């Protein structure tokens, strides 16, 4: 097979132009690294996510990492609890939490479920809980449905 240098150059230039023009391969405007494939598959570098204060609760911060446009059925984000922080919450959605660092405690009905780095905690819809930590916690949360705020 005889391929001309001009054809190779043209193909390489098109590939480079496409890669540079494709926002999915660039960090999102979210202040953290998120890359999205045209198929809809996306990846977030969780160690680049910087959480923001949540609801005026001292020591609690979070950051949603996907939009409803990116993931219309499931929501996701990162939450941090600092040095003994806790807050009360009633879930009108199902939630999975994956502990990334520290210790996450879910207090419910006088009992406590505790997870550490790598552990997964499931909290069913309708649960009235306290998110808590004896030291600190950083965890990824995944919620269904994504538009849980509209669930009432």
Regions found by a protein language model. Give the residues of each.
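Residue-level recognition of conserved beta-strand positions in structured domain cores
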Residues: 78, 91, 108-110, 133, ...
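Conserved short histidine dyad/triad with adjacent acidic residue
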Residues: 59-91, 125, 147
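A short, N-terminal "cap"/entry segment at the start of jelly-roll beta-barrel domains
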Residues: 12-75
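Alpha-helical scaffolds that organize eukaryotic protein assemblies
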Residues: 112, 147-152
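Short, conserved beta-strand element in jelly-roll/cupin
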Residues: 81, 90-106
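Short acidic-glycine-tyrosine-enriched beta hairpin
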Residues: 109-126
């Amino acid at each position: 097979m005889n391929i001309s240098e001009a054809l190779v150059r043209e193909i390489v230039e098109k590939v480079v132009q496409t890669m540079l023009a494709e926002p999915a391969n660039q960090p999102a405007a979210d202040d953290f690294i998120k890359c999205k494939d045209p198929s809809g598959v996306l990846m977030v570098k969780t160690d680049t996510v910087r959480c923001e204060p949540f609801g005026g609760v001292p020591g609690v911060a979070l950051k949603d990492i996907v939009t409803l446009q990116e993931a219309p059925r499931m929501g996701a984000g990162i939450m941090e609890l600092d040095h003994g922080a806790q807050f009360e919450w009633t879930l009108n959605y199902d939630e999975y939490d994956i502990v990334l660092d520290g210790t996450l405690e879910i207090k419910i009905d006088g009992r406590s479920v505790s997870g550490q780095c790598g552990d997964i905690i499931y909290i069913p819809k309708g649960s009235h809980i306290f998110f808590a930590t004896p030291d600190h916690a950083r965890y990824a949360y995944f919620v269904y449905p994504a538009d849980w705020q509209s669930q009432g």
